[in-house]
């Protein structure tokens, strides 16, 4: 912009103050922060320093491809400036700065996805220090400040000032104050009762606790006093100046701080005639002290680092308020050199599997220079909960995202990171208590890994834990299951479903439990995807007890008995298949039922009832896929059950008996429900049940006392046994 235009515009811009309303959720969040009492308010400084560090990361990354970006200020640093007179604490960084649009959007008008989630967490009793994890750390400034001013300069825009006292709105204006070059200055006008955050000792304590591992120098500016020896003339001059200054500031009550040296000294000076008369005065000066001189923790020897140091670094890296659960610190040398420090958090983030979320939380450095923190190629998606840093010696400093996608070095780093993560989980599994905490939070990630990562499937399968029919309230590994297998047992049996109680009471596990065969209960939706890929474990096939062709260990006598039953019930199976027609693929005698009369099993490669339920619940499901993937259903009957035996006798006496048809359909629909399927026409099934209830209660269908409405319903109800030929089951079904 030409200089003339700038000067012409300036007076207008000075007057032009734009006011904006905070987005509703942000206003609500600020109100919550201001009006609720929080004991650990100090986290505001961690959040603001963390934001400054991110801004410095961004400008450093941009400067790798375009060094001229740093012409507006080569030094990358963070300054903390407390001012007791004005009651302000200022945080200055030489980061990327913000344009006017950034200011308006980032600080008020566009709510981040975490705003609502954080408020819900707060109201549920979560700690305020979680704020950084939800991307709204800036607003923590209002824990201690009554007003916040943000002055910022981006290379592509003018210098702007943002200001708000959190009354539901904020202002933005062009800033005509001291030019910044580039960066952001956050000025906190502290509340009267929060002046402790202007104390040197307190600021140092907070930075050491939360931010000592930030990768840029954090310098504290403190006004101090020191004794200075001057001659009488100079002292008088200084006194006069101070008096004038005090008059100007209307503080004439305070005497200038001049310290007289003791009379002994004066006598000595009198004796020494060569020396001029001297006095000591207090001189004010600004002391600068760098607060984070610790070198990057990942470059140090793991043996020299304490658990506390790892904990402090983890917290400064992640803004987590809890300790990490486990840590892995290693370096790889040889053809390729890199160091890595990986952490497992104590709990999964609220948006772990959100698509919009960045794909990983590992910061990539090249020779101690931060490059990026969302490099998707660095670690697979199923390990996206791992936090940490990777520092490579071999990648070029100015590497772009496109180059990273093709980089062979990165592929090797990725392979090593996955290997070390699995090592870490295996080590963690040795401590039952800690592994239980880990598994509660991240079992879905392990199962997703089994589905996606064929190379590491075997190792990941060793990390799985499940409830079984023999484990009670304790989860066991597949290895534990194998050690308890019966001598003649060839397979690992499992059942999928919604809850532990539901699968434990399922008809499918009756025979297995009776024979003392352990069944694994898989009760998470992701288990269905997991077992599609996990076909075997330690040479033993995983077999679903809800699918056809279930082989159970049995001796010759049992086999012979089963064959006899098949022959005896062959005719009934044929009659039932004719009645059910296309509803089922076939009707067979079951070897898995004990107390239930029948069940519906699915074909070997089709979906289980549970998978069908999951797929039907998908918002974006493809109905054409549903048609051919929904499994072919097989009806299995229990030859030892009295209902089935009586039905056989009735069918053989008169296969055209209407009641046989009704009962077969009722049995089929009830078996569908108990096997976990849903009914296509639940109303018809309900009407059949109501009709049976009426028969059981002895209510006569032709009773004139029955009102018209119930008569109308009765007309729609399907017939039951004993009805005459005019009512036809076919018409209903």
Curated annotation (Swiss-Prot):
Chain segments carrying region Disordered: 225-279, 701-733
Reaction catalysed by this enzyme: ATP + H2O = ADP + phosphate + H(+)
Motif annotated as TPR repeat-binding, chain positions: 724-733
The record's account of how the chain is modified after translation: ISGylated.
Essential for interaction with SMYD3, TSC1 and STIP1/HOP, as annotated region: 729-733
GO cellular component: apical plasma membrane; axonal growth cone; basolateral plasma membrane; brush border membrane; cell surface; cytoplasm; cytosol; dendritic growth cone
Location, primary (coarse class): nucleus
PROSITE patterns: HSP90
Coiled-coil features, chain-numbered ranges: none
Positions of region (Interaction with FNIP2 and TSC1): 285-621
Main EC class the enzyme belongs to: hydrolase
EC number: 3.6.4.10
Region (Interaction with NR1D1): 629-732
Biased composition (Acidic residues): 230-246, 256-269
Region ranges (Required for homodimerization): 683-733
Subcellular location: Nucleus; Cytoplasm; Melanosome; Cell membrane
Keywords of the record: Acetylation, ATP-binding, Cell membrane, Chaperone, Cytoplasm, Hydrolase, Membrane, Mitochondrion, Nucleotide-binding, Nucleus, Phosphoprotein, S-nitrosylation, Stress response, Ubl conjugation
Notes concerning its domains: The TPR repeat-binding motif mediates interaction with TPR repeat-containing proteins like the co-chaperone STUB1.
HAMAP family: HSP90
Family (UniProt): Belongs to the heat shock protein 90 family.
Name assigned to this protein: Heat shock protein HSP 90-alpha
């Amino acid at each position: 912009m030409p200089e003339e235009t700038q000067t012409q515009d300036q007076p207008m811009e000075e007057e032009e103050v734009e006011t904006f309303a905070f987005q509703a959720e942000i206003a609500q969040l600020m109100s919550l922060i201001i009006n609720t009492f929080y004991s650990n308010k100090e986290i505001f400084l961690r959040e603001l320093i963390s934001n400054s560090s991110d801004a410095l990361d961004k400008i450093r990354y941009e400067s790798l491809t375009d060094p001229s970006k740093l012409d507006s200020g080569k030094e990358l640093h963070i300054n903390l400036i407390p001012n007791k007179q004005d009651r302000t604490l200022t945080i200055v960084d030489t980061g990327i700065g913000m344009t006017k649009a950034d200011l308006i959007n980032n600080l008020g008008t566009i709510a981040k996805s975490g705003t609502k989630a954080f408020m819900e967490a707060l109201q549920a009793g979560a700690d305020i220090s979680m704020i950084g994890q939800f991307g709204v750390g800036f607003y923590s400034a209002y824990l201690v400040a009554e007003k916040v001013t943000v002055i910022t300069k981006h290379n592509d825009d003018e210098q702007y000032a943002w200001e708000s006292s959190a009354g539901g709105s904020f202002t933005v204006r062009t800033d005509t104050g001291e030019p910044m070059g580039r960066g952001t200055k956050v000025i906190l006008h502290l509340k009267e009762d929060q002046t402790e955050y202007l104390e040197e000792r307190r600021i140092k304590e907070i930075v050491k606790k939360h931010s000592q591992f930030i990768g840029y120098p954090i310098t504290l500016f403190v006004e101090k006093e020191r004794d200075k020896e001057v001659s009488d003339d100079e002292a008088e001059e200084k006194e006069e100046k101070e008096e004038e200054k005090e008059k100007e500031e209307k503080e004439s009550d305070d005497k200038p701080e001049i310290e007289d040296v003791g009379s002994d000294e004066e006598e000595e000076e009198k004796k020494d005639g060569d020396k001029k008369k001297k006095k000591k005065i207090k001189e004010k000066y600004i002391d600068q002290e760098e607060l984070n001189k610790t070198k990057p923790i990942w470059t140090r020897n793991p043996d020299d680092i304490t658990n506390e140091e790892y904990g402090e670094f983890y917290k400064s890296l992640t803004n987590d308020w809890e300790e990490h659960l486990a840590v892995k610190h290693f370096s790889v040398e040889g053809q390729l050199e890199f160091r890595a420090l990986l952490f497992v958090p104590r709990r999964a983030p609220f948006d772990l599997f959100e698509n919009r979320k960045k794909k990983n939380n590992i910061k990539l450095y090249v020779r101690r220079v931060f490059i990026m923190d969302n490099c998707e190629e660095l670690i697979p998606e199923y390990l996206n909960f791992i936090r940490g840093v990777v520092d490579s010696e071999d990648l070029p400093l100015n590497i772009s995202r496109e180059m990273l996608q093709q980089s062979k070095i990165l592929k090797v780093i990725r392979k090593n990171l996955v290997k070390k993560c699995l090592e870490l989980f295996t080590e963690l599994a040795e401590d039952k208590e800690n592994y239980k905490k880990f598994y509660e939070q991240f079992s879905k990630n392990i199962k997703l890994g089994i589905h996606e990562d064929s190379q590491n499937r075997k190792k990941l399968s060793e990390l799985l834990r499940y409830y079984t029919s023999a484990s009670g309230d304790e989860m066991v590994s597949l290895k534990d299951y194998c050690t308890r297998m019966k001598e003649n047992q060839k397979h690992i049996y499992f059942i999928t479903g919604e809850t532990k109680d539901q699968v434990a009471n399922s008809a499918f596990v009756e025979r297995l439990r009776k024979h003392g065969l352990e069944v694994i209960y898989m009760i998470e939706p992701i288990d269905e995807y997991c077992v599609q890929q996990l076909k075997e474990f330690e040479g033993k096939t995983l077999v679903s007890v809800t699918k056809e062709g279930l082989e159970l260990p049995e001796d010759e006598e049992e086999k012979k008995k089963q064959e006899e039953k098949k022959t005896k019930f062959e005719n009934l199976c044929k009659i039932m298949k004719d009645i059910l027609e296309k509803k089922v693929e076939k009707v067979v005698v079951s070897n898995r039922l004990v107390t239930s009369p029948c069940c519906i099993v699915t074909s070997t490669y089709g979906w289980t009832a549970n998978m069908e339920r999951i797929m039907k619940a998908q918002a974006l499901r493809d109905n054409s896929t549903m048609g051919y993937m929904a499994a072919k259903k097989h009806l299995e009957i229990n030859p030892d059950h009295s209902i089935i035996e009586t039905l056989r006798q009735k069918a053989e006496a008169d296969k055209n008996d209407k009641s046989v048809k009704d009962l077969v359909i009722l049995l089929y629909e009830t078996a569908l429900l108990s096997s976990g399927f849903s009914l296509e026409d639940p109303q018809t099934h309900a009407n059949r049940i109501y009709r049976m209830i009426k028969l059981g209660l002895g209510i006569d269908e032709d009773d004139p006392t029955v009102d018209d409405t119930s008569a109308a319903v009765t007309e729609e109800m399907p017939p039951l046994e004993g009805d005459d030929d005019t009512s036809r089951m076919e018409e209903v079904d």
